[in-house]
Amino acid sequence: MPREDRATWKSNYFLKIIQLLDDYPKCFIVGADNVGSKQMQQIRMSLRGKAVVLMGKNTMMRKAIRGHLENNSALEKLLPHIKGNVGFVFTKEDLAEVRDMLLANKVPASARAGAIAPCDVTVPAQNTGLGPEKTSFFQALGITTKISRGTIEILSDVQLIKTGDKVGASEATLLNMLNISPFSFGLIIQQVYDNGSIYSPEVLDITEDALRARFLEGVRNIASVCLQIGYPTVASVPHSVVNGYKRVLALAVETDYSFPLADKVKAFLADPSAFVVAAPVAETAAAPAASAAPAKEEKEESEESDDDMGFGLFD
């Protein structure tokens, strides 16, 4: 099959990205630094049936999106984030599920000289198995060692590289000698597009319980503020009613004004002991009946025992 010319390829690419933007309401903008073609193929296969990966030149992606803004103006929010080595992952599935699938497709990678470290790298205390001739190599990196049974032993954990630092040749060589692959590379989610809204991927970690807790906290804050300023809202009205009722009771107690519930409060304040004694009286009345029953049972058992004593072994 003859290869299509560049103009045809561009035209088909524009049609493809526009079709995907129309068919899929959600997508990720992903960074693809240090992702090789073999790993990309594995990612596509693992996402088959769940999501579609589309890579391309930033200028072409921007041009396709700008040409489609008349049909969907919300796509303009994507344009500021199309920079660097990025692509799209389109999906109709749950975003958190697809995110987890992308994370599962990261592969460990060795440190290369000149690469920017995506994370801190710490060399743990260990016996390296390397001969004493490598001691100067560790000393040059400021790593404290000792010779143990003819091999070099690192005495304590050492932070070799910090996030964002450029990996030096010595650091890369040491990590390779120790068979440490400190980095993992894959598609990194940079932004999330969901039905016209765009937000950072950290939002996907917010659970329903966290949302519920934040909502209740907001309701409590609103109720507190409204109570202080005397502004009625749905959140504050129940508290206002209770507080108002307490004030009415207090007023009734201090004046001659009364109503049935206030009468109970006045009676309690006049003679609290009447309410305290009422409960023990009921308990005291029940106590003799309860004690009488065991006494009766005990008497019956005693009579049965006496009857048994009347018969001898040879009667």
UniProtKB/Swiss-Prot annotation:
GO molecular function: large ribosomal subunit rRNA binding; structural constituent of ribosome
GO BP field: cytoplasmic translation; ribosomal large subunit assembly
Post-translational modification as stated in the protein's UniProt record: Phosphorylated.
InterPro entries, per database record: Ribosomal_protein_uL10, Ribosomal_uL10, Ribosomal_uL10-like_insert, Ribosomal_uL10-like_insert_sf, Ribosomal_uL10-like_sf, uL10_eukaryotes
Annotated GO CC locations: cytosolic large ribosomal subunit
Ranges in coiled-coil conformation: none
Region annotated Disordered, chain positions: 285-315
Domain of life: Eukaryota
UniProt entry keywords in alphabetical sequence: Phosphoprotein, Ribonucleoprotein, Ribosomal protein
Annotated Low complexity bias: 285-294
Segments traversing the membrane: none
Gene3D superfamilies for this protein: 3.30.70.1730, 3.90.105.20
Ranges of compositional bias, category Acidic residues: 300-309
SUPFAM superfamilies in alphabetical order: Ribosomal protein L10-like
Subunit structure: P0 forms a pentameric complex by interaction with dimers of P1 and P2.
Protein task: Ribosomal protein P0 is the functional equivalent of E.coli protein L10.
Family according to the record: Belongs to the universal ribosomal protein uL10 family.
Protein name in the entry: Large ribosomal subunit protein uL10
Taxonomic classification: Eukaryota, Metazoa, Chordata, Craniata, Vertebrata
